């Protein structure tokens, strides 16, 4: 039976699962009925529209005057060349927002994304096909790579580039797919709560977890206009569950710490899955982990201190037992799924 309350239930649990380099699953709960979809839908839209990516916005091909032209010695006409070019996902290696990259190829050659890698750009889908030129052909072209968000049609790009370039539709978003599911979750014998399960796939320009963080930042920034004028108290009291929201990061995977392969593999073999497990350990317990060397120990200590949970500190205080129970529960659920 639902109790009468004066504030909404505060969700405090989050699970971050890195399925692959470009796919992640993020779960948050418990939400009161109606709150989950209210948050999930705009977050999904923001993943597509606010995540920063890179795209070619203009191309200039030697000997070609317009997009409906053809080029001697190239299998594709210019229109198909442009279609293939837009499918190649560029990533600028520096902090610049725009770069002009020049390429020159002599035939015979099949050109793919891997051939476009250089000191300025990285191609995150190197197997993508671009064009084929015969033995008598030479292909020289320049591409303008731009940093941006969302989608911008070529008509608007036209005003941003030089007249001798062909303007391209720009698909900046690196998010290929973002879906969410709502599942029921039990809270104190009450089944009328929900969890949000996001599955995010990116193209490799940014990782899925980074993309999700960026969309959350975008939502906070957009909402801040109300806080400034209406004097909103973001720390207003709300109902919460066992592990406090301020410690929610401790329920994230140790993969989030971006440790070296040696350190991560050592933790993995010791079946340490969550950041909270490290926060509960002192230095001697860490030293006792099999095959954990001095460098790995120092790395873990440095990372834990950086996120606010120094090894051996008493930051958690009265939350330790609750955290142990929650981690045990999560591990049990993981084992059941396996």
Curated annotation (Swiss-Prot):
GO annotation terms (biological process): DNA-templated transcription
Keyword terms of this UniProt record: DNA-directed RNA polymerase, Nucleotidyltransferase, Transcription, Transferase
GO CC, alphabetical: cytoplasm; DNA-directed RNA polymerase complex
Residue ranges of the region described as Alpha N-terminal domain (alpha-NTD): 1-227
Entries under SUPFAM superfamilies matching the protein: C-terminal domain of RNA polymerase alpha subunit, Insert subdomain of RNA polymerase alpha subunit, RBP11-like subunits of RNA polymerase
Cystine bridges: none
Catalytic reaction equation(s): RNA(n) + a ribonucleoside 5'-triphosphate = RNA(n+1) + diphosphate
Domain notes from UniProt: The N-terminal domain is essential for RNAP assembly and basal transcription, whereas the C-terminal domain is involved in interaction with transcriptional regulators and with upstream promoter elements.
The name this protein goes by in its record: DNA-directed RNA polymerase subunit alpha
Species classification: Bacteria, Pseudomonadati, Campylobacterota, Epsilonproteobacteria, Campylobacterales
